[in-house]
């Protein structure tokens, strides 16, 4: 229920209490991620209610309603994460295995190590490389706090530590040790680090006005592109609108899918996965990161997945009676007919 967004602030308190009761369940292993998971649950109780995508927001006319993560909470979590990393690195200076550079080798040879090709490659490497990896991780922890004070080095050190934890999840058969830290990093990701793809003109998103999935997609874009009207990335119009007929020549319209079509500001018509990759690029932040990752997948595979979802959307989502989603007046101003 918490993950679905049903009374999420109430359930976050309950989960925080349960988490606190289980904190010392394994005294043999010190897990630095557990306190941070508790911190995230506690912080969640102070977030504004009903963000976009939550169950409690599903029937609200405004998909976003001005929801924003309070800057104060974001800064507090960042400070605690930075202090925790640097303190953790400082305490490792009294450990001979970290000072000598052997700590990573001990991890790879421990019973917790996950048998894998990546582990075999690391064990095959010269001892000097293992030492450098150990000292590099130690230096990253110690320097996390000072580097996080500067806007240019902050995303770099954040990314380095995230990659370290993802690597440990791959190498160690005990994901709990790093999974909590990965969750912390996701919370502290700043969308401003990944700029949206700029365009001098607004893109037009044409959608099937009677498709339930398309309506959900439009509401998602309205929530994520919640900028002032002078700086928006998208305007919207149904495929059934006069604007679509005027914007796309008849011979070209006959070849287009009846789902979503993006007409860029420079007149390019994008379909299927190409349209959504463009949309994700224009949103910026984590969505542009997703776009970059999806570009590693062959386009034919992405288009196949798009067509598969489009073929079953009518059975999965209720048909809409109104071509324009039910929205507040200021959001309806972003629709053309």
List each model region and its residues:
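Short, positively charged
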Residues: 63-66, 119-122, 235-243
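Extended, low-polarity transmembrane helix blocks
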Residues: 1-97, 127-204
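Local sequence-structure signature of Cys/Sec-based thiol-disulfide redox active-site neighborhoods
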Residues: 198-224
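Solvent-exposed, well-ordered loop and adjacent helix/strand elements within mature globular domains
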Residues: 92-133
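Conserved helix-turn-beta segment immediately C-terminal to the redox Cys motif
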Residues: 222-236
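Thiol/selenol-based redox catalytic cores and closely related redox-interacting motifs
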Residues: 239-337
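Short, acidic, Ser/Thr-enriched surface-loop or helix-capping motifs
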Residues: 86, 208, 264-265
């Amino acid at each position: 229920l918490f993950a679905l967004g049903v009374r999420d602030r109430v359930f976050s308190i309950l989960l925080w209490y349960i988490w606190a009761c289980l904190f010392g369940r394994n005294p043999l292993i010190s897990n630095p991620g557990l306190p941070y998971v508790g911190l995230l649950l506690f912080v969640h109780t102070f977030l504004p209610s009903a963000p976009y995508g939550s169950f409690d927001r599903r029937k609200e006319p405004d998909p976003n309603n001005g929801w924003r993560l309070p800057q104060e909470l974001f800064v507090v979590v960042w400070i605690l994460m930075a202090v925790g990393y640097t303190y953790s690195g400082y305490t490792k200076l009294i450990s001979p295995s970290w000072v000598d550079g052997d700590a990573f080798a001990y991890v790879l040879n421990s019973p917790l190590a996950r048998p894998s090709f990546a582990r075999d490659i690391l064990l095959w490497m010269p001892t000097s490389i293992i030492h450098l990896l150990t000292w590099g991780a130690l230096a990253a922890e110690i320097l996390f706090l000072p580097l996080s004070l500067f806007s240019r080095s902050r995303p770099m050190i954040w990314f380095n530590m995230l990659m370290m934890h993802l690597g440990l999840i791959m190498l160690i058969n005990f994901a709990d040790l790093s999974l909590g830290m990965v969750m912390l990093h996701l919370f502290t990701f700043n969308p401003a680090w990944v700029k949206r793809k700029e365009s001098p003109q607004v893109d037009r998103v044409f959608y099937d006005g009677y498709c339930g999935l398309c309506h959900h997609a439009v509401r998602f874009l309205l929530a994520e592109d919640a900028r002032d009207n002078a700086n928006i990335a998208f305007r919207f119009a149904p495929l059934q609108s006069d604007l679509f007929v005027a914007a796309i020549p008849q011979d070209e319209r006959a070849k287009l899918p009846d789902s979503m079509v993006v007409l860029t500001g420079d007149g390019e018509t994008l379909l299927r996965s190409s349209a959504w990759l463009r949309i994700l690029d224009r949103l910026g932040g984590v969505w542009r990161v997703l776009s970059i990752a999806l570009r590693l997948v062959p386009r034919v595979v992405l288009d196949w997945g798009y067509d598969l979802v489009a073929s079953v959307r009518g059975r999965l989502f209720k048909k809409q009676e109104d071509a324009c989603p039910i929205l507040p007046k200021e959001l309806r101003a972003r629709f053309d007919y």
